[in-house]
From Swiss-Prot:
Coiled coil: none annotated. Belongs to the TRAFAC class TrmE-Era-EngA-EngB-Septin-like GTPase superfamily. EngA (Der) GTPase family. GTP 2 binds at residues 182-189, 229-233, 294-297. CDD domains: EngA1, EngA2. This is GTPase Der. The gene is der. The keyword Secreted does not apply. It comes from Desulforudis audaxviator (strain MP104C).
Length: 438
């Protein structure tokens, strides 16, 4: 059964993201004093008292939505309200009830969705609570909280889960978590939207439009995926604003909590030094990786074939040469359906377990075909080996002396494992441990 969705809405800077982070117990949304910092819908699963639901943080609703970005944020809020079973309408207890709040309340009443009025920034519960004005909204009894201090959050969550239908939190298999990383404006958000078939992530020609690592839940054929769309990573020297700084950290953290990375390149730019750095982060994090060359529709008439360009990309990213390279267009949809199929293939390799007998046969053959060079009169000897991890696969080789392993021979063994077993799109870790021969 699908988990219920709870959407947090309200005008800018009332503390929606602070409440979102408080409920999650970690900083998932960028929090800043600048109004409108959260622009996209952020999705996270919450477990409260054994009940599970999806919490959605949205951008602030602007009553004077003259700017294009404000209109886009408003559209994101509208979509979140459409898919939510419950809405948390957050207001500022310090500012009191404003005309914008009344206008938003009217919008919520028209939605016919259940609403909990959450009065935030109530930092002192020993004084009379400033709630009288908020009853005027006609949306029920206000719930006072302090998201910053964590006051009354438990009572709020009790109210949230109280109205959920029985069985709504049945456990399901874990979704595949996919980090979408790349330089600013290579089309990461457009690509996610093309896969999803709807605009969940704000798309703009302005680099850096996506500020948060935006978690988007997606289902296909009974399989769940979570796309983590990060702000584009810029060169370190360019990072001056705190929001850009946090976005770079968020991209790295997104890789840490993902299973697989889509490293997005821009066909019109070729492979840049920054692309190499970002691909390197995915490799260092030990994630399954797919290289996605976006804007391939612009290759038409250029005389460049997909196979030739893919080889060029592999040469430029030779350190991650095991990663599949897909040429797609988020605008036209060209090649986009292949992405999830490739994700499934790579995830199968990422979680693959090799029988110990097969692994020993492969590596013993590798030692026989090309024996390791002697060093200081000693030669590396393999006793036996075993797989010690998946995601990514890691193999532990028990040898007479790990100090005899050269970087070149380690690469040779990895290549032999790949030649025999594949592991397309997946880093392979070869580890060594001393064991004296009997």
């Amino acid at each position: 059964m699908t988990k219920p969705v709870v959407a947090i809405v309200g005008r800018p800077n009332v503390g929606k993201s602070t409440l979102f982070n408080r409920i999650l117990g970690r900083q998932a949304a960028v929090v800043d004093a600048e109004p409108g910092v959260t622009r996209d819908r952020l999705y996270q699963e919450v477990d409260w008292a054994g009940r599970h639901f999806i919490l959605v943080d949205t951008g602030g609703i602007e009553s004077q939505a003259g700017e294009d970005m404000a209109n886009r944020v408003f559209d994101q809020v509208r979509r979140a309200m459409a898919e939510a079973q419950l809405i948390l309408y957050v207001l500022d207890g310090n500012a009191g009830l404003l005309e914008e709040d009344v206008q938003v309340a009217a919008l919520l009443r028209r939605s016919s969705k259940p609403v909990l009025v959450v009065v935030n920034k109530v930092d002192d519960f020993s004084r009379p609570l400033p709630l009288a004005d908020f009853y005027r909204l006609g949306l029920g009894e206000p719930v006072p909280v302090s998201a910053a201090q964590g006051l009354n959050i438990g009572d709020l969550l009790d109210l949230v889960v109280a109205g959920m239908p029985a069985g709504a939190d049945e456990p399901r298999s874990e979704p595949v978590r996919i980090a979408v990383v790349g330089r600013p404006n290579v089309g990461k958000s457009s690509l996610v939207n093309a896969i999803l078939g709807e605009e969940r992530v704000i798309v703009s020609d302005v680099p850096g439009t996506t500020r948060d690592a935006v978690d988007t839940l997606f289902r296909r054929d009974g399989r769940e995926y979570v796309f983590i769309d990060t702000a584009g990573m810029r060169r370190k020297a360019r990072i001056r604003e705190s929001i850009e700084y946090y976005s770079v950290l968020r991209a790295k953290k997104a890789l840490e909590r993902s299973d697989l990375a889509l490293v997005v390149l821009d066909f019109t730019d070729g492979v840049t030094n920054q692309d190499q750095r970002i691909a390197g982060l995915a490799e260092e994090a030990g994630k399954g990786t797919i290289i996605v060359v976006n804007k391939w529709d612009l290759a038409e008439g250029s005389g460049v074939s997909a196979s030739r360009y893919q080889e060029e990309v592999r040469r430029e990213l030779i350190f991650i040469g095991y990663a599949p390279v897909l040429c797609v267009s988020a605008v036209s949809g060209l090649g986009v359906p292949k992405i999830l199929d490739t994700v499934e293939s790579v995830m199968g390799e990422y979680r693959r377990q090799i029988p110990t007998s097969m692994l020993n046969r492969i590596l013993q053959d590798a030692f026989m075909i090309s024996p390791p060079p002697a060093r200081k009169g000693k030669r590396l000897k393999l006793m036996y080996c075993t797989q010690v991890a998946t995601g990514p696969p890691a193999f532990l080789l028990f040898v007479n002396d790990p100090g005899l392993v050269s970087p070149g021979y380690r690469r040779y063994l990895e290549n032999e494992v790949r030649r025999a077993l594949g592991f397309k799109g997946v880093p392979v870790r070869i580890l060594f441990r001393r064991r004296e021969s009997k």
